[in-house]
Amino acid sequence: MNQRTVVLDRVMLASLVWGDVDDTDRPLAVLLHGFPDTAHTWRHLGPALAEAGYRVVAPFTRGYAPSAIPEDGSYHVPALMHDALALHQEYDGDDRAVLVGHDWGAITANGIAASAANPFRTVVAMAVPPLPTMYPRRGDVGRWLRILPRQAALSWYTLFNQLPRLPERSFDRLVAHLWRRWSPGYDPAEDLAHLAEALPDDEHKAAALGYYRAQSRRRQLPHPYRSLAADWLAEPEVPLLYLQGADDGALDPRWADRIGDRLPAGSVVAVIEGAGHFLQLERPDVVNARVLEFFGASR
């Protein structure tokens, strides 16, 4: 594992890399982390993909050190999509490239999967499915209503993170609580240490919280990202692998049961037993095998 830094047109991003990222004979794999997490979340999948012949780039997404806090202050999903697309270009990706995202990274990846600007062959989303697949539909409203109350209770933190100053002041306690609730039985000590390095002060913590706050301020989306604004709420157009932990404490696992027939042909949905929200860390053997199998089948 090494670290590479690139200056994109809107922000500087540092990434963990595996494999020879300058060897364009290898297909590119871009891995996007979520909240409250860092690029180190890919410490199992990254080496597995490199061993399978990929060159792997896992950025610390905007606002997470050592990446920069963006000057435009945007943490809107289209801005995150823009960064991932820019990484594909910066690292000379081609139509063999693949994209993997977890949590906010999954929201970003799902948006790219729905975009006409998508250069990736296929996409893996973990822990958050494409948002349109979660909407109610005819004949499914009853099941949707049965999931909704529990999901609303699980998602309390999304409203808490909208508050001014309080989330920053209680940030360390909040994220430790979320890790333990979202992935019961998993020891997050190493991941929380990485997170403390990535978000060392209130400015960086506000950046991480900005991902949530930006969604209630969509009219403030900077102009360079507006061409992607509708995509993250659209249905994916390329085959997608969706993975969710059976014990996920952030997103009710029952969502996985109702989305398969709303994904493009060639897509796969799998619930990982013995894993919660951070399934790539809890069951890396199973997750790595699922991802590699899907990438092989979609070639």
Task: Please provide the spans of the model-predicted regions.
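Catalytic histidine-centered segment of alpha/beta-hydrolase-like enzymes
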Residues: 275-284, 288
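Conserved alpha/beta-hydrolase "nucleophile elbow" surrounding the catalytic nucleophile
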Residues: 33-35, 101-102
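Catalytic histidine neighborhood in serine/cysteine hydrolases
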Residues: 253, 262-277
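Flexible "cap/lid" subdomain of the alpha/beta-hydrolase fold that forms the substrate-access gate
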Residues: 1, 10-13, 21, 28, ...
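A short, Lys/Arg-enriched amphipathic alpha-helix followed by its capping loop at the start of a domain
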Residues: 45-54
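The serine-hydrolase catalytic nucleophile loop
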Residues: 35-45
